[in-house]
Amino acid sequence: WIMGHMVNGIDQIDEFLRLGSNSPEFDINFDKDAKPVYTYHGVPCDCFRSCLRWEYIGDYLTALREVTTPGNPKFRENLSLFVFDLKTNSLYDSQAGKAGENLADDIFKYYWNEGNNGGRAYMIISIPDIEHYDLMTSFKHYFISNGHEELLDFVGFDFSANDNIPDVEKVFEKVRVPGVPDRVWQSDGITNCIMRGLNRVKEAVKVRDAGGIINKVYVWTVDKVPSIKAALDAGVDGVMTNHPDVVVGVLREDGYKDKFRYASYNDNPWETFKAE
C-alpha cells in the first residue's frame, strides 16, 4: 500500500491518487468534548509540505464516500484503504471512549451513509497514545450495539507512538471483543525531516511473520529512494510518503517488481504475507 501522507484537503485526494497513492492518510482533530471536527495537521509538519490544509470532517468523509462508491461519477477504483491519524493528545485519557464513539458515529453517518450504499474502502484507525485504548473498544461497541457489526470487517487499528512492541501486544490482547477478530497494523516512523533506523520495523515484521497479533507493518514518512528501498527490504506492507510517484518508481525497478506489487481492492489488508 502506498499511503499518501497528510491528505487533509478534499482536492488533495485526487492529487495523491493521480500520483499513485491507493491509501490516503489524513489527520482528525477533536474538540474539548471529544467530538471529531476537522482534518488538520498544523505546524510543525513534514519538511517541504503545507501544514495548514483542512476540511470539516463531514465534508471530508462524504468526499471519501463518493470516490469509493462504485457507480458514483467520482469513483476511483484504486483507492482501497484509508488511514485516520487521530490527534487525541489534546484529550484526557478519560475522554478516549467518548472520542471513539463520536468518531464511529461520524464514519457511520458520512462515510457509510448509515448503512445505505456507503463507501467500500477499508480503514485503519491510528491512535497516537497507547493509554487511549478505550477509543478502540467504544468504536467497536458502537457498531455492535447498532446492529452493524459487519462493518467492523473493514476496520483495523494501529498505535502510532513507536511504543515497545510487547506493550502494544498487551493492549490489543486487553481490548479484544468476543467475535471481532484482531485486525492490526503496526506503524513505525518519524517526520521526513529526521532520519530513523529500522530496528523497530524489523521487530514488528518478526512478530508479524511469527503469527503474532500484528497483521501488517507500515513505515512513515519516507520520501527518498534509498529510504523507500530500505523499508521494502525490511519487509513492510505499506509505505507512507509525501511522494507516491517515487514509491511507484521503486516498485517498477528490478529487484522490487517481482517481489512487491501495487495493492488493489481485492487484496485483503488484514491478511498477513511473510517477508521472504
Curated annotation (Swiss-Prot):
It catalyses: an N-(acyl)-sphingosylphosphocholine = an N-(acyl)-sphingosyl-1,3-cyclic phosphate + choline; an N-(acyl)-sphingosylphosphoethanolamine = an N-(acyl)-sphingosyl-1,3-cyclic phosphate + ethanolamine; a 1-acyl-sn-glycero-3-phosphocholine = a 1-acyl-sn-glycero-2,3-cyclic phosphate + choline; a 1-acyl-sn-glycero-3-phosphoethanolamine = a 1-acyl-sn-glycero-2,3-cyclic phosphate + ethanolamine. The active site is at H5, H41 (nucleophile). CDD domains: GDPD_like_SMaseD_PLD. Pfam families: GDPD_2. Mg(2+) binds at E25, D27, D85. Keywords: Cytolysis, Dermonecrotic toxin, Disulfide bond, Hemolysis, Lipid degradation, Lipid metabolism, Lyase, Magnesium, Metal-binding, Secreted, Toxin. Disulfide bonds join C45-C51, C47-C193. SUPFAM superfamilies: PLC-like phosphodiesterases. Transmembrane segments: none annotated. Its cofactor is Mg(2+). The keyword Secreted applies. Belongs to the arthropod phospholipase D family. Class II subfamily. Dermonecrotic toxins cleave the phosphodiester linkage between the phosphate and headgroup of certain phospholipids (sphingolipid and lysolipid substrates), forming an alcohol (often choline) and a cyclic phosphate. This toxin acts on sphingomyelin (SM). It may also act on ceramide phosphoethanolamine (CPE), lysophosphatidylcholine (LPC) and lysophosphatidylethanolamine (LPE), but not on lysophosphatidylserine (LPS), and lysophosphatidylglycerol (LPG). It acts by transphosphatidylation, releasing exclusively cyclic phosphate products as second products. This is Dermonecrotic toxin LvSicTox-alphaII1. It comes from Loxosceles variegata.
